[in-house]
Amino acid sequence: MFHKAEGIVIRTVDYGESNKIVTVFTREYGKIALMARGAKRPKSRLTAVTQLFTYGMMMFQKNAGLGTLTQGEIIQSFREVRNDLFRASYVSYVTDLTNKLTEDEKRNPYLFELLYQTIHYMNEGMDPDVLTRIFEVKMFTVAGIKPELDQCVSCRSTDVPVGFSIKEAGFLCKRCIEKDPHAYKITAQVAKLLRLFYHFDLQRLGTISLKPETKATLKTIIHQYYDEYSGLHLKSRRFLDQLESMGFHDQSTD
């Protein structure tokens, strides 16, 4: 049976001399794996649409196991992302996270839209670091590890949080901060941003500019939380960290 779906290529693996197996996150079917025969040949009609990060309309035959991609049409190639090592590294991490945290053929139109908007904004030159933090926070629920971001995880107070506890999995108010001596001390702004990143609609994102120290705090907390609860150890994240430590930056800000 033949099917048609909008999808973003989140992983590719060479198969034989001329074929590819592509993992596509689709709006209609969730994550699917497709054999793209001949896609490695330069003149193949499947070459362009099976490039990593490409957003396209995919026509495929669904089999018992691996499906077969028969035709594709590019909707958006995200050229600016693919031509910039730094931004491409952020998108690699975002797509890697999507791949690792989702099951095959589990439809999730919300997640598809989140993935698309994240890559789209990066392609438009918006801060990839901030976009990645937003994506990570929104993926807490998909990973099944959402922390308490609406009240104190200990006493349920809605007072302004003064700490984030990895151990307790959420915010701590000033009365409960001593319950975890290892809790991160946070400002009201950091607490507000973590809550905002989780709840707001990414399509409504305007211009957002954060101080380097604020971004560093958010990254540390979010990554420590993932390390503690997700069980993931992604090469794409390590590579991105290495680029940052070597002084690489987003060329769109030059």
Swiss-Prot record:
Name of a matching Pfam family: RecO_C
Domain of life: Bacteria
UniProtKB keywords: DNA damage, DNA recombination, DNA repair
Gene Ontology cellular component terms for the protein in this record: bacterial nucleoid
Function, as annotated: Involved in DNA repair and RecF pathway recombination.
GO BP: DNA recombination; double-strand break repair
Protein family membership: Belongs to the RecO family.
Gene3D superfamilies noted in UniProt: Nucleic acid-binding proteins (2.40.50.140), Recombination protein O, C-terminal domain (1.20.1440.120)
InterPro entries recorded: ARFGAP/RecO, DNA_rep/recomb_RecO_N, NA-bd_OB-fold, RecO, RecO_C
Name by which UniProt lists this protein: DNA repair protein RecO
Gene encoding the protein: recO
